[in-house]
Amino acid sequence: MSLLLEPSKEQIKEEKLYQQMGVSDDEFALIESIIGRLPNYTEIGIFSVMWSEHCSYKNSKPVLRKFPTSGERVLQGPGEGAGIVDIGDNQAVVFKIESHNHPSAIEPYQGAATGVGGIIRDVFSMGARPIAVLNSLRFGELTSPRVKYLFEEVVAGIAGYGNCIGIPTVGGEVQFDASYEGNPLVNAMCVGLIDHKDIKKGQAKGVGNTVMYVGAKTGRDGIHGATFASEEMSDSSEEKRSAVQVGDPFMEKLLLEACLEVIQCDALVGIQDMGAAGLTSSSAEMASKAGSGIEMNLDLIPQRETGMTAYEMMLSESQERMLLVIERGREQEIVDIFDKYDLEAVSVGHVTDDKMLRLRHNGEVVCELPVDALAEEAPVYHKPSAEPAYYREFQETEAPAPEVKDATETLFALLQQPTIASKEWVYDQYDYMVRTNTVVAPGSDAGVLRIRGTKKALAMTTDCNARYLYLDPEEGGKIAVAEAARNIVCSGAEPLAVTDNLNFGNPEKPEIFWQIEKAADGISEACNVLSTPVIGGNVSLYNESNGTAIYPTPVIGMVGLIEDTAHITTQHFKQAGDLVYVIGETKPEFAGSELQKMTEGRIYGKAPQIDLDIELSRQKALLDAIKKGFVQSAHDVSEGGLGVAIAESVMTTENLGANVTVEGEAALLFSESQSRFVVSVKKEHQAAFEAAVADAVHIGEVTADGLLAIQNQDGQQLVHAQTKELERAWKGAIPCLLKSKA
């Protein structure tokens, strides 16, 4: 029971207690001006979460406006729970990515689990059935005991929630770098399927309509979670463990099915997840979007704990809760549906016409605030921006090729780097086949799910090489989008749209804000050229630990459409005798590469460059060749360069090998030049494929001897290794590191 006396309005101002909630002096003065009086404790708490970066994007809005958000297929862009893209036949795909970085740093299992739960609710609140989950994870070096603990617990949290709720986790990425040592990144993406007629919005329309609370009871977990997510991590962050929510996937499964049934009922007017800022954000945002107000009686809120105050109820981020607006007089229809699932559905208020959020508790009005001020009128900051000194130095430094004395040894070593190594240890914990629609499981360039009753399928991926962004955020931003699109194309799909998760450090530092601006410029340019609009996403700033920022990490989630399941393609070579091609030229580009990090222990120099027009041309040519049936396998060349891409392609259930000839010195095998693919083609399609893909160069063929042999044009042997030995090293690296005591 809460025994604390809340401070008075005067105390809040005089003692500047609002600063503890992340509200600045100027913001407090603005709040006072907007409402024409001093706010009470509940009201300043509500303003603090709604005006946090996590909810308001007050530091990032000027940057987000750069993104293209419309397109022929876009049915819903940014502004709702998730974006929606048309895929024909009156069907649409719904998807969104969200972060749960700060909670995962201090309570990794629950932090990751509730991140999955929250993004699933965002998707089904739009009326869609979630069909897949992906995740993009970043950790410090896997030699650290603390990092091993975080890694194991985060993966267990994702598996524990996703497996229980029955949604397959079909893909994602895991990368390791010292910059994430104290601040791991846990980004979760959910993809759903919907018929056009079932699309719902989070709007509180219709004066007098009933506001209903459904799902789990409200507790004290997660209070100020949104504020916690809007500040730097420090040694004292452990004290904020109560700001981490606790999830119940079985409750979420019931809530999902009940909500999807309610969506078929025309009594439903609007629906929204109680995510960041809980009851506060869902009520204020739904009213603001509809141009209405909401009045609620907090005495009616289902509570898990006794003696909860209005402040605690409004700021709680207890999981598995939704807010619904129902036609007046039809409440019992909704109650009956939720009763079937043994869930509470309680009328707690109604829609008004005065654009106010009015809350009653214990017979008193404890809050009366304008909804637009909460949801739309947070101050927007144009932060100072300054190019960091290291950037100019890197731009003027062509990173030399690291010395490669033995390319076979180097290939083995690269395949065992945790960022490149097989993530089988991770995805074997996920149920990626549940619901039996998964056609391409984790481990290829993208996850692929069929759409039952049609010939269509969806490909999905997440991508970002943060090292490139550290060296050059604009070029790195372009590359992140391009690599995601390459992965989609390699699966036989046309890239449709993007959801982005902008993970950066403290925007109040000019060098960090410069990174954000430049990365957004690069992402925007790539999305325009590749025709992949940004339909939603998330911003996670203040990712710093004791003053040290993470690498800039704008994760790109992308979905593509496969028109015919016959076009589905994977990265693995299929049969001996097929011809091996590389599309795109290899340049001596080693800055930010896995080879540079491994051999020199740091990254520096001018980042790899990308020509987006060439990228688009190659993607279109390859996709056309795939659709015509010329391509047996396709794999994009990324971390570790051509050598790693060929090795990954040759690791199949058959004991295949490859004999290829490449140009140049051994180190070039591991250059990370952009816009490249490794492709295999049947001999009978050689002429047609070469005519279709002008940039393709024939470098060898798939063999049946289980041997990877790579030589240069001078006849010098570069790599000579048994495929199964390479695969054993690649698959064993992460389990081996986790078992070691170091």
From Swiss-Prot:
Pathway participation: Purine metabolism; IMP biosynthesis via de novo pathway; 5-amino-1-(5-phospho-D-ribosyl)imidazole from N(2)-formyl-N(1)-(5-phospho-D-ribosyl)glycinamide: step 1/2
CDD domains on file: PurL_repeat1 (cd02203), PurL_repeat2 (cd02204)
Annotated protein name in UniProt: Phosphoribosylformylglycinamidine synthase subunit PurL
EC number: 6.3.5.3
Record organism: Bacillus velezensis (strain DSM 23117 / BGSC 10A6 / LMG 26770 / FZB42) (Bacillus amyloliquefaciens subsp. plantarum)
Residues binding Mg(2+) 1, per UniProt: 98, 538
InterPro entries to which the protein is assigned, alphabetical: PRibForGlyAmidine_synth_PurL, PurL_linker, PurM-like_C_dom, PurM-like_C_sf, PurM-like_N, PurM-like_N_sf
One Pfam family recorded for the sequence: AIRS_C
HAMAP family: PurL_2
GO molecular function, one term: magnesium ion binding
GO cellular component, as recorded: cytoplasm
Domain of life of the organism encoding this protein: Bacteria
Binding site for ATP: 57, 96, 500, 537
Keywords: ATP-binding, Cytoplasm, Ligase, Magnesium, Metal-binding, Nucleotide-binding, Purine biosynthesis
Compartment(s): Cytoplasm
One record GO biological process: 'de novo' IMP biosynthetic process
Binding positions for Mg(2+) 2 per the UniProt entry: 122, 273
Quaternary organization: Monomer. Part of the FGAM synthase complex composed of 1 PurL, 1 PurQ and 2 PurS subunits.
PANTHER family: PHOSPHORIBOSYLFORMYLGLYCINAMIDINE SYNTHASE SUBUNIT PURL
Membership in a protein family: Belongs to the FGAMS family.
Catalytic activity: N(2)-formyl-N(1)-(5-phospho-beta-D-ribosyl)glycinamide + L-glutamine + ATP + H2O = 2-formamido-N(1)-(5-O-phospho-beta-D-ribosyl)acetamidine + L-glutamate + ADP + phosphate + H(+)
Source species taxonomy: Bacteria, Bacillati, Bacillota, Bacilli, Bacillales
Ligand binding (substrate): 99-102, 121, 245, 317-319, 540
